[in-house]
Amino acid sequence: MGKEYGLVDPDPVETPGDEWDEIDVSDTEADRIARERDREFDQFRERLTDADQFKVEQSVFDDATLAALYKLVQDGHVEAFGGPLSTGKEANVYLALGPDETSVAVKVYRINASNFRQMREYLEGDPRFEGLGGKKKDIVLAWVKKEAANLDRARKAGVRVPRPIATERNVLVMEYIGTDEKRAPRLGEVHVENPETAHEVVREYMRRLYDAGLIHGDLSEYNIVFHEGQLVVIDLGQAVTVHHPNSRAFLERDCANVSRYFGRQGVDTDEDALLKYLTEDSTDSA
């Protein structure tokens, strides 16, 4: 990452308050579509599962997931599907074509393969999910809704994150961060010639998240990407509210990861100083 790119400072915006809307995880329209299996859905299902880029990913696309993708197409959020951008144990991310020929990212969570016990640990204590049951499907659907809500809240707080577009069951559609050729590189994948500036931006993003009542929970050089002169924070699915019983431990871990990375880049920083900066005189407190 060369100096010619520069790093833009985040635009100051009014941070959201401490209100948290309850998130519904009841059956979706996709569940109904999967149950009824009409002819149009069956045709869509056959086309998608026969596509070359999806033939090796059959475990991801059960009927309910295909119904969710079908509903997203019907609603105009997705017009065509491309190949995978990344694959993981719990979710795959695919490039897709959205309205007006814009590229979007489609994140598909595997309900059967997801570590729902770990997911539940992040959901418990979140006021948006009070009374959430123990069903695996409900946990994963809540996680998808949570990721979209976290992205939306972070954007309102002035943090550069992918814009959430739509959710349907275990699928999240969001802004694609990258070029026609490839996804944006992670901070840990590039040479940073201006690490002090990058550190200041990341520190400010962490502060804005905290002031908005959120803690990333897994922040490191691998959950920050560089795109068009900006640092973009990604993977907010596990982000918790400051009211979460483990919020302090998650915040301390984020501070340790960020300080360790920038310390290796020659920046004079330490996790205690970063933690103090984030929490002292904040508009919220853990």
Predicted feature descriptions by range:
Residues 88-97, 164, 201-238:
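Active-site acidic catalytic loop and adjacent metal/ATP-binding pocket
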Residues 135-161, 187-217, 221-222, 260:
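Conserved kinase catalytic-core helix
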